[in-house]
């Protein structure tokens, strides 16, 4: 898909990976919908408009199905039909399994997996009529290989992989692609809190011997959006941490 003038909705895009993905699409000439649970600041909107594109902020809770629908409707009223949906929003709540409450588990799945379902189903209603569209879901290497203390997060991200492949099969006849990106250890405020010792241990496990950048993930999103013959795939952006035979 050529991105000039298209409308791209990126959930959880007020900072980190989501914001960088939004900027990358703006650089390609796409109009951007910034999203978060709180009201989007005018300064943030202006930073995207500086690329010469339109940008609106749409706040709301993706884990609420009706709220997800309302956000899609608001976007369509302001910018027209959505051409690309990037399901980036996600949370963590790391604890060892025996210390994890039912609420700890459910909360992470509700945002990471149910939220992805909510936004995808709501946006597909019009995409199917358009017979064109791109859906990109953010998974994680944790969903591919597991990680101690992340049973809830890994389960949610593994669910995103299965969801992505199933949706891809359903919508392919209408010319819509659905893929996932599985980032590894990416330098963000979430990894900044790790101790130097932990960072060194992690780095030693990565073949490329370094953390990735938010730009690495954003480039993967642009690649998938521009690749109409790739669907149902999981693109690892992890420095070689997970290698499939």
Residue ranges of model-derived segments:
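Conserved glycine-rich cofactor-binding loop
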Residues: 7, 14-15
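Conserved glycine-rich Rossmann-like NAD(P)H-binding loop of the short-chain dehydrogenase/reductase
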Residues: 28-43
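Substrate-binding pocket helix/loop in short-chain dehydrogenase/reductase
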Residues: 96-97, 104-109, 202
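Active-site helix of classical SDR
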Residues: 120, 156, 164
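C-terminal substrate-recognition "lid" of short-chain dehydrogenase/reductases
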Residues: 124, 132, 210-237, 242
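Alpha-helical segment proximal to the catalytic Tyr-Lys
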Residues: 125, 169-173
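Residue(s) in the substrate-gating loop at a strand-loop-helix junction
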Residues: 140
């Amino acid at each position: 898909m050529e991105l000039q003038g298209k409308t791209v909705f990126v959930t959880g895009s007020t900072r980190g990976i989501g914001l960088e993905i939004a900027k990358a699409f703006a650089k390609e000439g796409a109009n951007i919908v910034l999203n978060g649970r709180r009201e989007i600041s005018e300064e943030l909107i202006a930073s995207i408009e500086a690329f010469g594109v339109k940008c609106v902020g749409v706040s709301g809770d993706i884990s609420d199905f009706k709220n997800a629908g309302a956000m899609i409707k608001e976007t369509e009223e302001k910018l027209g039909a959505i051409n690309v949906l990037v399901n980036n929003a996600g949370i963590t709540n790391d604890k060892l399994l025996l210390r994890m409450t039912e609420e700890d588990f459910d909360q992470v799945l509700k945002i990471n997996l149910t939220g992805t379902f909510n936004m995808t189903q709501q946006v597909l209603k019009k995409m199917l009529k358009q017979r064109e569209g791109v859906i990109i879901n953010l998974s994680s290497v944790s969903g591919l290989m597991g990680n101690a203390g992340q049973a809830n997060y890994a389960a949610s991200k593994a669910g995103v992989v299965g969801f992505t492949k199933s949706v891809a099969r359903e919508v392919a006849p209408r010319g819509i692609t659905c893929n996932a990106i599985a980032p590894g250890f990416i330098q963000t405020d979430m990894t900044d809190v790790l101790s130097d010792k932990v960072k060194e241990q992690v780095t030693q496990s990565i073949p490329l011997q370094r953390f990735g950048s938010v730009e690495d993930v954003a480039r993967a999103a642009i690649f998938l959006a521009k690749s109409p013959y790739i669907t149902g795939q999981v693109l690892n952006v992890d420095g070689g941490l997970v290698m499939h035979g």
